[in-house]
């Protein structure tokens, strides 16, 4: 995961101090790209421990089209608690846009089902896109989508994915996002009969919060370890049929967790 460490070093070395919505303050760079070959191991950080269970359940929650945190709470995941209202609702966030984008004629467009169908019918299409950024709904979301658009690409029997992330909390959020979209790429590859290719992560405003700088330096002081491998139940051929038990992370040997506060 040297790609991620390079990003930390770039922000610490050349980042611009900026004010932000949370009032915490950041060091920020604009425009950065990382590429991960999914055949070379599952891109889960080894220089600090990440919560595999939370990453998987959040992705399954997105794919269920849900926007209430009940499913997450029922599965011991608390990463969205700070943004939910008293009823656990978040407004029309990721799951709603992915699975039921509101069309002008009143239909809900299932972008996930549509993109999988298009990959199978026309793998050379340049329209293999899913967007979570809906200007008509942004003001009703508890948190507008940070990872807001992704595109698939098929070549040589392999499926690659590029994510555009407008706002990237590099210490806390980005490691989650890398693992989540790498896993999504592997899942979509399996249900479309392809092999996983690359995950490409393109960042807009990539930042370290001012209260994460010491933690980033600590992480950079740790040597990287071999990447783990991800095994997915090969019997699952429907993207919406996956369960937590269908995923097995093997040979994950990270350094200890590094605590950092979330900026809300």
Swiss-Prot record:
Database matches in InterPro entries: Thymidate_synth/dCMP_Mease, Thymidate_synth/dCMP_Mease_dom, Thymidate_synth/dCMP_Mease_sf, Thymidylate_synthase, Thymidylate_synthase_AS
Enzyme class: transferase
Pathway: Pyrimidine metabolism; dTTP biosynthesis
Residues annotated as catalytic: 146 (nucleophile)
Cystine bridges: none
Protein residues bound to dUMP: 21, 126-127, 166-169, 177, 207-209
Job of this protein: Catalyzes the reductive methylation of 2'-deoxyuridine-5'-monophosphate (dUMP) to 2'-deoxythymidine-5'-monophosphate (dTMP) while utilizing 5,10-methylenetetrahydrofolate (mTHF) as the methyl donor and reductant in the reaction, yielding dihydrofolate (DHF) as a by-product. This enzymatic reaction provides an intracellular de novo source of dTMP, an essential precursor for DNA biosynthesis.
Protein name: Thymidylate synthase
